Amino acid sequence: MSSPATWQAARERVLLFSRRLLAERLVYFTAGNISMRIPDDPELVAVTPASTPYDTMRPEDIVIVRTDGRVVDGALRPTSELPLHTLTYVRRDDVGGIVHTHSAAAMAVAAMGIGIPPILHGLVSACGGGIVTAPYARGGTAEVAELTASALRDRSACLLRNHGVLAIGPTVDHAYNAASVVEGAADAYLRAFAFRPVPQIAPDEVERIRREQWAPAWARGPLAPTHGG
C-alpha cells in the first residue's frame, strides 16, 4: 500500500513535467494533461487538475485517483480527460505515465489527419515508428481512449484527430520524451513537405531501430527527456 510520502513524490514529478510542457510550448494556458502511476500502488494515479494554469499549479493541486476514476485525495477536480488516462492504464499494465499535449505543429498534422511517417531516426527510437492519427472523438469521453488503443498498440504516441498528441511510456519520463519528439517531428515534416515529398526511413531500418532502441527502452526505466537526433 502506498504512503503519503509516495503520493507527494508523484505529485512533484507530475508538476515538474507539467511545467516543462509549458516551457517547451507543448501546451498553452490550461490545455493538455499529465499523469503517472503511483509506483508502489498500480491502482492509483497522480493526475493534473482541471482548468488550472500550469504556472500557478502546486504539488497539492495534483489529484490522486483510482484507475476506476474515483478521487482518493485532492481538493480540485481531475482533468476532464480523466477517462483517457484511467482507461489506458486499465488496458495497459505496462504503461506508467501518460502525457497529452496541444502543441502547434502536431495539432496541425492532427487536423489534416495525415499522421507523421517515419522520417527521422529520433522519432522511430522514441516512439517506435511513424505516428498514426486516431479517428475523431469528442474530448473528455471514454471513446477517445477506445479509439487510441489500436494506434498505441505498438507505438509510444499517436495523434488525436482535430485535437492533439497522446504519448505513453513505462514512466512519465518516457511519455514526456515521446510527446516532445512528436512535436519536433511534426514541425520538421510540415516544413519539409511544403517543398517536396519527404523520404521515409526504409522499413527494414525502422524495424532495426525499433528492435535495438525503442523496445528495450520500455524495460530500462526512467529516461532523461531528449529530442533524439
What is each of the regions a protein language model found here?
Residues 1-229:
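Glycine-rich flexible loops
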